[in-house]
Structure formats: C-alpha cells, structure tokens
Amino acid sequence: MAASAAAAGEGMEPRALQYEQTLMYGRYTQELGAFAKEEAARIRLGGPEPWKGPPSPRVPPELLEYGQSRCAPCCICSVRCHKFLVSRVGEDWIFLVLLGLLMALVSWAMDYAIAVCLQAQQWMSQGLNTNILLQYLAWVTYPVVLITFSAGFTQILAPQAVGSGIPEMKTILRGVVLKEYLTLKTFVAKVIGLTCALGSGMPLGKEGPFVHIASMCASLLSKFLSLFGGIYENESRNTEMLAAACAVGVGCCFAAPIGGVLFSIEVTSTFFAVRNYWRGFFSATFSAFIFRVLAVWNRDEETITALFKTRFRLDFPFDLQELPAFAVIGIASGFGGALFVYLNRKIVQVMRKQKTINRFLMRKRLLFPALVTLLISTLTFPPGFGQFMAGQLSQKETLVTLFDNRTWVHQGLVEEQEPPSTSQAWNPPRANVFLTLVIFILMKFWMSALATTIPVPCGAFMPVFVIGAAFGRLVGESMAAWFPDGIHTDGSTYRIVPGGYAVVGAAALAGAVTHTVSTAVIVFELTGQIAHILPVMIAVILANAVAQSLQPSLYDSIIRIKKLPYLPELGWGRHQQYRVRVEDIMVRDVPYVALNCTFRDLRLALHRTKGRMLALVESSESMILLGSIERSQVVTLLGAQLSAARRRQHIQERRKAQMSPPSDQDGLPSPESSVHFQVNTEDSAFIPARGETHKPLKPALKRGPSNASKAGETSTGSMESAGIALRSLFCGSPPPEATSDLEKPESCERRKLKRVRISLANDADLEGEMSPEEILEWEEQQLNEPVNFSDCKIDPAPFQLVERTSLHKTHTIFSLLGVDHAYVTSIGRLIGIVTLKELRKAIEGSVTAQGVKVRPPLASFRDSATSSSDTETTEVHALWGPHSCHGLPRDGSPSDSDDKCQ
C-alpha cells in the first residue's frame, strides 16, 4: 500500500505543475499557460495522460497521405516559423505591427491622392484665369463631380460608410452589434469615398473616418489571422483590438500617437481597460513612425518632423498678462463649440421635418450633396467672394499660415514681412486682415456644419480645428494691434506671437466640439512645440466646462440623430438625479413566461412584446425569477408545437388506430382512448409532442415513493414538479444510476410506440385527411398543452438589480458591463425591468414618458422612521406573502415596451 501510495504521489506530481518550495513563496517549475496548452493538445489529439506512462508517437491522419510529398516540408517549415514567431514575439505584437503598418500605408496613400486632386483643381483654376466664366465652371464642376461620385459609390457599395464612424464605433465598443459596419466592402467604400470627398476641397475632416477605417482594418486582420489559429479565433478578443485600432486611426492621421491614444479613449470609451493601454500606444507609435518615414521617402520632408511645425520663441513664449486673453479664447470657444453642435443637429432635423423636400431628396439621393457642394464652391470662388475668406487656400495651407509666428498687422520689422502668396490670401486689395479673418470664421462655421451632413464619408474635427485656429489668430492679431510694441516686463519688451493664440484657439474649439481634453496633446504633437502648454490647457478646460453644460458632444449628437443605442453621461450640477432610484423609473408590467405555462400563454407573451428577451418565472403567483429566455427560442417552441410535421404525425396515429385489425385490439383500449392515453402520458411526463422522442424527467420518477401514494398529494405535487422542472432546466442529464425500475415500463412502452409508427401515405394524402375546422380544433388542443423548456437555451443568471439601487449606481453598472437591460427583483421576485430607454429618459429628465409608471424623484426619500428595523421586517414579510402586490400595470398599451431589450 505504501509503495502504491508513493507511486501515486509520483504519478500525480506532473499534475501538480511540479511545485517546489523555496525560501519565501514557493514556485512552480512549469508555467500554468504551458501546462494548459499541453493538456489541451493532449485532449484534442486523444493522447495518453503524461503521468500514466510515456506517450506513444502519433502521426495526424491528415498527414499520412501526403507525408512524402513536396508540400509537406513547406507546411512543416511554415508551421515551425509561425510557432517560433508566436513563442518569441507574441501574437499581440505581430497583430499590432501589421495593423500599424497597414494603416500608415493607407493614410499616406490617401494623403498623396488628396494632394494630387487638390493640385489638379488649382492647376485647372490657374490655367483658365483669362476667362472668368470658364474658371468658375472649372472651380465648381470639379468638386461637384468628386462629391457626387463619392456619394453614389458609397450608397451603392456600403451605405454604412457614410459619416464619421466614431459614433458607430462608440456603440460597437459598448457591446452593440451593428451589421456590415466592419466588413471589407465598407472598408473599400470608406477609403475611396473619403479620398474623393477630401480631394474636392470641401470643409471636411479625416480623423473621424480614419478611426472607423482602422477599426475595420483590425476586424479584417483578426479574421485573417484566425485562419492560422491562436487567440483571435475568440471573438471577445476583437473588442480589445478595436480599442487599439481607434488609437491607431488618430495616430496615423496626424502623426500624433500620444494624443491619438488619449483622444480615442475619450471619444469611444466610458470605462477603459488598462490592459489595452500599451497596445494602443505601441501600434499608434509604430503607425505614426511609418507614416512620417514614408513622407521622407517621398521627399516631402527632409527628416521626421511635426506635421505643422512651428517656430515659436522658447525663452519667453508668452507673458503672464496674456493669460486673461487665453481664458477668453477658451470661454468663447466653449460657446462656439456648443453652437456648432446645435447648428449641425438643427440642419438635420429641419431637413427631416420638411416631408415634401425630404421625400424628393430621398428619390434623388445625389441631388442634395451636389447642391451643397455647388453652394460652397460658389462662395469660395477666389476671384469672387472667396477672395475675402482666403478661398484659394486648402486646409493644410490655411493651418500653416495661421500657425505662423510672424505678425500680419505689424509691418515695422523686416523679418515680420509676409510672403507674397500669404499676403494676397489674407490681405485682399479691398479688405484687411481682421475683416478677412471674421468673414472666414463666420462662413466656414456654417459651411462646415452644413457640409458634414452630406451623405459621404467625412469628419468634422479638421474643419473645427481650422476655425478655432482662425479665431485664435484673430485674437492674437488684435492683441498685437493693441500692443504694437509688445508687453513690457522688467525693462524687457516681448512682442506678442499671434501664432500661439491660433494654437490655443484650435485646441479649445476642437475640444469643445468633441468634449475632449486630449486635443491639447494633439496640438503639441502637430506643432512639435510645448511652449504654450499652460495657455492651451487653461483654454481647453474652460471650453469643455462651458460646452458640456450646454450641448452634448458632436458624436453623442450624431448618435441621437441616428437613434443608435447609447447611454448619456450624468450631467454635472444636477443633484436631483442622484436621488432617483430604480423603483422610480422601472417598467412594472414586465413580459414574462411561467414555468408551468401553456403554449397559449407563449403566444400571448409574443403578441404583447417585441423584446429580444423574456423573463422566465416559477409561476404567475410567486413571480420568482428563474432566468431569461430569448424570443427566438420561444418562437421555435411555438412553431414546433403547431408545425405540419406534428399534424402529419397526428394523422398517422389516427389512421393507424383506425386500420388496426380487431384481433390486435384484444385487451387494448379503443382508438379514442388510446389517443387520449398518449396525450395524457405526454402531459404527465411534461414533454412536448414533437417529431422526435425525448427522455422523461428521471428526477420526477424518483421523487415519489410509489405511484399509488401520489393520489393524495395533489397540493404538494405542483411544488415538487416545479422544483423538478427547474433542476432539469439548469442541470445536465442525470447520472445513469438515477434510473429506477419505475420508469422502465414507460420507456419500453415508448419504444414500442416508436416502432409501430410507419408511414402509410404521402404528405398530400395526409394533408387532405383534415378539414380546416379540424385543423383549427387540433391547434386549439395543442395550444392548451403545457410547455417543456428542456430543449431551450435559458440564461439562468440574468442581470438583476434591487429596487433601492440609485440611478448613479445603475448608470455606472450599465456603462461598465455594457448591459442593455436589467430585471428588478425583491428577494428573488420579479417586480420590474430597466432598459436603456428608461435609464436614458431618467438621465435626460424626461422620466414621465408615456407607458412608464414613474414616481417623483423625491418620492424615493424615506423618513428616518421608515428606516427602522420593524418597518423593514414588515416589508420583508409582506414581500413573501403569496398574494402580495407586484406593482400596477402600465397605463399604456402592451406595445409600449416593444423596443425594450433591443
């Protein structure tokens, strides 16, 4: 015995991961991950257990036939290289490197194509400057053709590619499945459509669409790498890669990896997993590096520099007395950002409310983008009105001139003289710098708000960024005009740098529109200087404080316009929201099905709601929540019960009963009683009559000591059957030893019935055996039979809340876990449901919506007397009562809750 015990101990040593005791903590000599992989490989290949002897060599059967072919060494070599790379480098590193490389190539190629398109427009305009009419036609026709092609190509190939893409990614990362948003055709439509849209010269952006493009690239790359196996076969892993891809999209767009990571976190996530932090930084940094290296390779740059490099003085970038001016820029940008979001949303709402115009434009889908492009191109025509708003400059050229550190209005020094091209753009003959900047800001403001509504792939970050830079430049030029000799400090004179004000304004307005602070970091990486870090941070924070109190962010506004599932943030300064509880906002008339219900009850529950999930309770009296069941499962159950196969089975059984000879009927009941006996047997076994035969519930047979003793236990039989059915739903199949002698005759009888079911006629003959009245009567009989949920996929632990949960905690739970609904229970009893719809209305202040029984927010306060132990004990006993009230039904129709759980 001792020897066997020692042998057993030695045999179990590998099972214990070869643990050895050390000085302090002890350690395992075998990694847990390696051990798990070896065990998984052994189980998959069916090899012997390592502690039961040395494993015998085994050759996979698929390699036996081609073991001596030429492809075998190549396959073996590729597998070994893949394993070496995965083991030495890691799958995450390989994926992130490929993602960064692909996105850098796409970004550089797109910028190259956009630059070619813009140069072609300038070449056409300058080549026809002798004829003003032809020059106007060329200036207007070129962007109209590109925008029309972009809109048509996107609508035909993938309408999901329209717009920014950040609102959709924010919804997807929250757990909502949006079809066709991460497919290959959407990727192609987004890339080509965005290139044409930006090449037209319209005030559109690139950053938002590139977040969507990077996410699609990550999704497609995950599917490709899953062909070789590995962790990317798991779909839940893709969410982490999408979070990193959002950072890559911003990083390769502006060559700003740090700001890209922070910006992607702010605009797409409410709660961010820190484990994805390094993935975003690594991939975004690699992508930005390749993006700038390609610019050097194409000889666009001499070395790797910032995208909009500035040359502000570093010894004294700004004076302390200039901080109030920077604060004014931040506050004004906050109001401007809120106004931009409001104007963008109002344009869409006005177009939707005009039914006649909307129907006409829906039939002529390309007319609206063509008209908008024609209007904007006409206003920006350089010889016309465009000369007063620098219409001949592209967005990149505009930013370069606005970030210039030289003063435009002060012409006292030689080094402050502007180049001729810039002087002609911002100093037209019949206007000055201030008038040009004011017209530029006003015109670009509403043009950008209108252009972002065009159904093409486009963003709004870059136009807003340019408008903010122009506003900051206007303030800077005004300060330079008011203090022409600069601000005197301790006998030293430091002239004002208007370019620094432009940097502050760009970051402030972009942060106000997007509700982000990371725009400050993006500005530092774009300019390559951090000299104005304090003014930029002050302006961005003030702009966010003002904008967040007035309007949602641009992306949240688009989410509301598109009616995507979302959960708004709890606004600051609204203390009454923290006093609302779940019982004040929950829907009390919850659609549910009982464990002992009939198929008629299932049909009624399906007619009452269109929700995706239905609550499963023990009974209508107890309302004990057992789980949740999908609507598709209920539809399948009901369809199988009333299917044509069951009707044919019923006809077969009736014909067999009629055609049986009298000699075979000796000692057997009549056909009518035989059919009635089969139906009663199925009811007592709680098994739906389907085409196939199900095993009876074995625990139900073991509970009673004898069949004769069940006659006087009617009251306790229902309670026992509920527990038996509950165990059969959430437990696996019973062990073989649970089979008793009492179930053998029934199983034998079922086997006999199965053997005699022989088809005697074809389907057409069987269908003609029953009249419509008989079919209707048969369906009514089937609807009265009890339901067996044994074959349904039931969630035994749906998410639950208690009625005293606060709104703040509920919002945190919904945001953190990504759930779309939660059942409200009190000591296990279902009393209500809370979905995103109710939670959203409670946060936005419209909690008195139709169909939702809502108590006032202050009604949730309890006096000190009601919090005593006696009162709570009384409430607990009242909840356990068999006839306690579960809440009043809603005043609205049952269809009011149709959109819950969506």
Swiss-Prot record:
The record marks H532 as: Couples extracellular acidification to the channel closure. A motif (Selectivity filter part_3) lies at residues 459-463. Residues 166-173, 241-253, 257-265, 499-513, 514-515, 516-527, 528-532 dip into the membrane without crossing it. InterPro entries: CBS_dom_sf (IPR046342), Cl-channel-2 (IPR002244), Cl-channel_core (IPR014743), Cl_channel_volt-gated (IPR050970), ClC (IPR001807). It is found in: Cell membrane; Basolateral cell membrane; Cell projection, Dendritic spine membrane; Cell projection, Axon. Residues 648-748, 860-902 are annotated as: Disordered. Keywords: CBS domain, Cell membrane, Cell projection, Chloride, Chloride channel, Ion channel, Ion transport, Membrane, Phosphoprotein, Postsynaptic cell membrane, Repeat, Synapse, Transmembrane, Transmembrane helix, Transport, Voltage-gated channel. Residues 671-683, 706-719 have a biased composition (Polar residues). A motif (Selectivity filter part_1) lies at residues 163-167. The modification Phosphothreonine is found at T22. Residues 586-644, 794-854 form the CBS domain. It catalyses: chloride(in) = chloride(out); thiocyanate(in) = thiocyanate(out); bromide(in) = bromide(out); nitrate(in) = nitrate(out). This is Chloride channel protein 2. The gene is CLCN2.
